[in-house]
Amino acid sequence: MTSQLHKKGEAWSARFSEPMSELVKRYTSSVFFDKRLALVDIEGSLAHASMLAAQKIIAADDLAAIQRGMAQIKGEIERGEFEWQLDLEDVHLNIEARLTALIGDAGKRLHTGRSRNDQVATDIRLWLRGEIDRIGGLLTELRTALLDMAEKNASTIMPGFTHLQVAQPVTFGHHLLAYVEMFSRDAERMIDCRKRVNRLPLGAAALAGTSYPIDRHAVAKTLGFDGICANSLDAVSDRDFAIEFTAASALVMTHVSRFSEELVLWMSPRVGFIDLADRFCTGSSIMPQKKNPDVPELARGKTGRVNGHLIALLTLMKGQPLAYNKDNQEDKEPLFDTVDTVADTLRIFAEMVAGISVKPQAMRDAALQGFSTATDLADYLVKRGLPFRDAHEAVALAVRVCADRGCDLADLTLEEMRKELPNVAHLIGEDVFSYLTLEGSVASRNHPGGTAPEQVLAAVKAARAALK
């Protein structure tokens, strides 16, 4: 079956001797996902029309009609009244057809000096620029929530882990600040990516530019671009800016996923460091006692989704010769879904972090296990003249003794410690036990980047200042 609308003629139909089949029409149409670009498409078209009038390529009356018609179309779209037509293929031709129906020949003059190739590239950049700014704001909200929680827990002691084994005591505030650093780098990547997004392709036309006396810099200024794409072939054909954004988004989600993994572990009754607010959890259809951390679990899963979009976009571009190819129609759905996934995740996590209930005693009890102050004992011996490797070996022997006895280093008396460490007994004094307390351990890491409560509060203050 073929389309009867072809009798009216598509924007390009005069070249062909038979109409497009309905199957091909459905296969090649993008309007039901690229209509998301409608408002930026109108914005770009208005800037283009203003330039055409300023350059006397179209008449002032045509510009006025275009502006009037676009205002009506924008209202129809915002009210949900616009009738999108599959037969008109994409967002651009749908809007142009409606404009022409409203204002006549002036609508047909709008496309002078441009192609859908540079038009869609402009639309995507305009849209993505706004979404980058939105995501930047959401990253700020998440970091603010983490900083609030870190400040409240600057002195809350928990075990630090390597290989998921207890390593050394840290503060919960210090642990959260690690994620503040990760998300801060993510924000920097978004800002840097925005610089390359914010270049105007319009004026490149199909691929070679246009013979009309256009003013690309004027359009760039009107639309808030930092400049123009310098090469017309590159302007219409590459989507590296979208790939770069998706790569930055994949890193955002990777950091979210790492945090999610810890939230799931911490909430487990076997660990019990935190509890998440009920509104971020679900129950079980069969087990009435269950409270499942579905939000962080789902965030881990959605990370794979964004990673997949990155691979999809890289694969999309890898085999394309210059200039524009229809392949690029497939750039939008991965890009749109990446934005939606990242934005929704960041918004939810900012709210979820603010609602975390911390269980300090459970954290402290866990930090007392696993000989977390063993390194402090080694440092104690080093400060009394013993080479570090010798101190390391001596403390390792003491740990083995305590493990056999089922006690901690701090549980040994001074006499027992000297007895078990005869080679260094002369270096061990009564003050050794102050080094084996959790508070003493974290307080001793009192340098920039360290876990001492004083440093945690200083880091929170610095991070807040950086957000302003």
From Swiss-Prot:
InterPro entries in the cross-refs:
Arg_succ_lyase_C, Argininosuccinate_lyase, Fumarase/histidase_N, Fumarate_lyase_CS, Fumarate_lyase_fam, Fumarate_lyase_N, L-Aspartase-like
Enzyme Commission number? 4.3.2.1
> Which biological pathway?
Amino-acid biosynthesis; L-arginine biosynthesis; L-arginine from L-ornithine and carbamoyl phosphate: step 3/3
**Family of the protein in this entry:** Belongs to the lyase 1 family. Argininosuccinate lyase subfamily.
Would you tell me the Gene Ontology cellular component terms?
Answer: cytosol
Matching entries from PROSITE patterns are given as: FUMARATE_LYASES
The gene from which this protein is expressed is argH
Q: What is this protein called?
A: Argininosuccinate lyase
Pfam families xrefs = ASL_C2, Lyase_1
Q: Which UniProt keywords apply?
A: Amino-acid biosynthesis, Arginine biosynthesis, Cytoplasm, Lyase
Q: Which organism is it from?
A: Paraburkholderia phytofirmans (strain DSM 17436 / LMG 22146 / PsJN)
Instruction: Kindly state which reaction or reactions the protein catalyses.
Output: 2-(N(omega)-L-arginino)succinate = fumarate + L-arginine
Organism lineage: Bacteria, Pseudomonadati, Pseudomonadota, Betaproteobacteria, Burkholderiales
User: Lyase: present as a keyword of the record?
Assistant: yes
